[in-house]
Amino acid sequence: MRVDAFDFDLPSERIALRPARPRDAARMLVVDAGNIVDAGVRDLPQWLRPGDCLVFNDTRVIPAQLEGLRGEAKIGATLHKRIDLRRWQAFVRNAKRLRVGETVDFGSGVAALAEERLADGSFVLAFAGDEPVELLLERAGTMPLPPYIAGKRGADEADRDDYQTMFAREDGAVAAPTAALHFTPELLAALAAAGIATETLTLHVGAGTFLPVKADDTDDHVMHAEWGRIEADTAARLNAVRASGGRVIAVGTTSLRLLESAARDDGTITPFAGDTSIFITPGYRFKAIDGLMTNFHLPRSTLFMLVSALMGLETMQAAYAHAIAREYRFYSYGDASLLLPRQSGRSRTLS
């Protein structure tokens, strides 16, 4: 499909720079088949059924944004993907001033060697010393806010909490699974009281999630890879949910992408550990999920393509036009949407 089919105009004032407080006070646009309903995140239990299961991503965002010097040249780096204990793939700003074999001093006793430059222009950075890289980042790094926020304000101490979900426990993400930012202990208690189950998986969200689609056609876009894991007991419980008539609702596109990566053609979810570069566009045959809770996404982005695949492009265009007109808050710190497609069997294709 043409990428420009997924374009729309978003007024800049609709971009949220801070989250709702409390978190579950955010608004939620429900798209139930073709119906569009204004609601709030706290209404979520009313839109689900006893026996349904919400699936969260438990990745933890690390302070992966670094600023340093190579001699007198200022070098910025956003860590993207862990390679091993000491090496990370990173997107580098002012990359023309950095060559393979040179060292960047990030301050606070943190330095890294530019070990290799990859075909996509990113670098492999090898960190010096024996301390775990995650500890080095706590000293020298800042939270890697999305560019549409960072372009308007710098990261601050509040973001260390605001840009972390209550489920975060597995270090490795450089972007938050933002749909889960809306959840609070009180909301989880209400969901449990309504008979809604919860499960977790891990997908370490990379900085590639913010990369623009430069191709003119979706067939020509190369999707970034991210590492994920679904434990065997988690997969078994999710399969039991669907076998008993419950629905699997992914909380966030990261959870959805990993579940779909781990699913067989018959919809059975299998244990998974490895990279996924799944790219979901209209015409995709969904296998593992029955709904999605997600924030509002950028025009022309792979994530708007994903929700259009789930609900239909015309439906999502109408939903986003409604959200803009009703002044919903967009993107990572913004409001939520709950997408419930028409059910047509366990595996289905929507376009």
Curated annotation (Swiss-Prot):
<dbReference type="InterPro" id="IPR003699">
    <property type="entry name" value="QueA"/>
</dbReference>
<keyword id="KW-0808">Transferase</keyword>
<dbReference type="InterPro" id="IPR042118">
    <property type="entry name" value="QueA_dom1"/>
</dbReference>
<keyword id="KW-0963">Cytoplasm</keyword>
<dbReference type="GO" id="GO:0008616">
    <property type="term" value="P:queuosine biosynthetic process"/>
</dbReference>
<comment type="similarity">
    <text>Belongs to the QueA family.</text>
</comment>
<protein>
    <recommendedName>
        <fullName>S-adenosylmethionine:tRNA ribosyltransferase-isomerase</fullName>
        <ecNumber>2.4.99.17</ecNumber>
    </recommendedName>
</protein>
<keyword id="KW-0949">S-adenosyl-L-methionine</keyword>
<dbReference type="InterPro" id="IPR042119">
    <property type="entry name" value="QueA_dom2"/>
</dbReference>
<comment type="function">
    <text>Transfers and isomerizes the ribose moiety from AdoMet to the 7-aminomethyl group of 7-deazaguanine (preQ1-tRNA) to give epoxyqueuosine (oQ-tRNA).</text>
</comment>
<dbReference type="GO" id="GO:0005737">
    <property type="term" value="C:cytoplasm"/>
</dbReference>
<dbReference type="InterPro" id="IPR036100">
    <property type="entry name" value="QueA_sf"/>
</dbReference>
<comment type="subunit">
    <text>Monomer.</text>
</comment>
<dbReference type="GO" id="GO:0051075">
    <property type="term" value="F:S-adenosylmethionine:tRNA ribosyltransferase-isomerase activity"/>
</dbReference>
<dbReference type="Pfam" id="PF02547">
    <property type="entry name" value="Queuosine_synth"/>
</dbReference>
<dbReference type="GO" id="GO:0002099">
    <property type="term" value="P:tRNA wobble guanine modification"/>
</dbReference>
<comment type="pathway">
    <text>tRNA modification; tRNA-queuosine biosynthesis.</text>
</comment>
<keyword id="KW-0671">Queuosine biosynthesis</keyword>
